């Protein structure tokens, strides 16, 4: 999120990724690619028609080769150029911990 001054206001670091995902919503099932990931949300690239305000359930294939990361409820916050920004609304505690651990390791490795 950008402030009118152009300064980034994000409180959580984002990790650029290329993780396959499957998702479903009200009368919608699709596939996509997560292009950036943070604890509170992600950006997804997909050919499916999503709308702001849609609610989705996601399963993200993580590089650790364990079971897919489960995001039980995510809300579409923005749409632009074939991508959508999702806010995670409900994530199981074990998946929340796994996501935070994965991000901490990956972001630490980049620094």
Predicted feature residues:
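Structured alpha-helical
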Residues: 1-111
